[in-house]
Amino acid sequence: MTGFELLHPGVQHHVVNSLGWPGLRPLQDEAIAPILAGEHVLALAPTAGGKTEAAVLPLLSRIATDGWRGLSVLYVCPLRALLNNLHPRLERYAGFVGLRAGLWHGDVGASARNRIFDEPPEILLTTPESLEAILMSTRRDHAGFFAGLQAVVVDEVHAFGGDDRGWHLLAVLERLSAVAGRDLQRIGLSATVGEPERLLRWLVGSSTAPSRVVAPDMGSAAPPELTLDHVGSLTNAATVISRLHDGEKRLV
C-alpha cells in the first residue's frame, strides 16, 4: 500500500481533484506512514521539494480520522514572512476536510488573536516567541488552549538547531508537552543538513518515542560546482575577490 492510500479519503480526493496532482512526490509519500503512526520525523528535501505537504497532508488525515478536537497542530517557522506566505496555502488544505488554519505572530492584531482564542483553529501557524508569550500570559487560559495539542511541525528546523533560539524553542516545546499532558509528535522540515540524525535527536528532545529521517530525494541532488584558481598571494586574492562582484554584497 502506498502512502497516498493511507491518507483520509477526503484528503485523497482533493489532492487529485482540487490540486490536480498526478501523484505525490517520493518524500511526501514516504513521510505519510511514520507521521500517521505518530513517530517523530525529520523530512529532508531540496527547496520547493514539497516538504510542507509531506507534513500537513498526513496530519490533516490524523485530525480527521482520530477525532482530534480544538487546536491540534502547531506549525512553527523562524520568520513571520514565511508564516504569512504559508498561511493561505494551509488554510486551503485544512478546508479540504472541513478544518481551519490560523495565524498568530506579533503583527497579528488583538482582535484576530482574541478570535483564535475564542474559537481555536485545528492548525496554528506561529513563532517560538509568540508561543512563549501565550504561555506566559496571565490573562489567557493557555492550559485550556493547548489541551488538545498533539503535534508540532518545525519548518526550516536547521535555522534553529543548536543556537540560542533553538534551545529556546526546545524549552517551549517541553513546556507545551507538560501543559498538554502528552508527548507531542515533532516533525522537522529542512533542506540539506550535514548530520540529519543528530538534528533529529536534537529536535526530539526528551521524548523516547520512535523517530526517523525521511530523505528519499536527497541522493539525487545536483553536486555543487567548485572552481579552483591560483592567485599567488593574499593581497592578490583580496584584489580578485573585490572584482568578482563589484558593488554587490557577498559572503566570503
Give the ranges of each region predicted by the language model.
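Conserved pre-motif I regulatory segment
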Residues: 1-44
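Conserved SF1/SF2 helicase motif Ia
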Residues: 49, 61-86, 179-183
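Pre-Walker A (Motif I) flank of P-loop NTPase domains
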Residues: 37-43, 70-73, 121-122, 185, ...
